[in-house]
C-alpha cells in the first residue's frame, strides 16, 4: 500500500514498477488525498488514477480531511516513512528523505493506523474519474499544463 497526499507518478520507471508488480499478482493499493493543500493536485492525479484502475490497482481517496502522510508498506515486512510524495518533484527535484523499517514489532504497531486510514477512505471507481463535471475536466486540463 502507498499512502501519499499527491498521486502523480509521471516518472515512467515508477509507473512501470507499479504496473509490473500488479502483473506479477501483487495487490497494489494507493491511498491519496482528494483534499489538498496544493492547487490542482487532485485534478493532476485523475489521468494516473484512470490508468491505475485499468491496470487493476486499487485507489482510495481519504475522506477525513487532508492526508499528508507518506507511507509505503510492502508485504507487511517493509515500511517506508518519510517526506517523499508520489510525484516527479519528490523523485527528481526536491530534497526528500525516507526511512526504511524492517522491524516487525514496529510495523505491527503502524499497520492498524494504515488500516484505519483505509477505513476512512472511499474506493475510487472508474465512474468517479470518468464522469467529471465540466469544471473538473477544465481543471484537469489546466493541471496537465503545470504537471
Predicted regions and their residues:
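PLD/PLD-like phosphodiesterase catalytic module centered on the HKD motif
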Residues: 6-147
Amino acid at each position: 500500500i502507498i499512502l501519499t497526499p499527491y498521486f502523480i507518478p509521471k516518472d515512467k520507471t515508477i509507473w512501470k514498477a507499479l504496473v509490473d508488480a500488479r502483473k506479477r499478482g501483487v495487490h497494489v493499493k494507493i491511498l491519496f488525498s482528494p483534499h489538498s493543500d496544493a492547487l490542482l493536485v487532485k485534478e493532476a492525479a485523475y489521468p494516473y488514477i484512470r490508468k491505475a484502475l485499468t491496470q487493476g490497482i486499487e485507489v482510495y481517496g481519504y475522506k477525513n480531511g487532508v492526508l499528508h502522510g507518506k507511507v509505503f508498506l510492502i508485504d507487511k515486512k517493509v515500511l517506508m516513512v518519510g517526506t517523499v510524495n508520489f510525484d516527479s518533484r519528490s523523485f527528481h527535484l526536491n530534497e526528500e528523505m525516507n526511512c526504511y523499517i524492517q522491524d516487525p514489532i514496529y510495523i505491527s504497531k503502524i499497520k492498524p493506523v494504515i488500516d484505519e486510514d483505509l477505513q476512512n477512505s472511499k474506493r475510487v471507481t472508474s465512474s468517479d474519474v470518468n464522469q467529471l463535471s465540466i469544471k473538473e475536466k477544465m481543471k484537469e486540463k489546466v493541471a496537465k499544463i503545470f504537471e
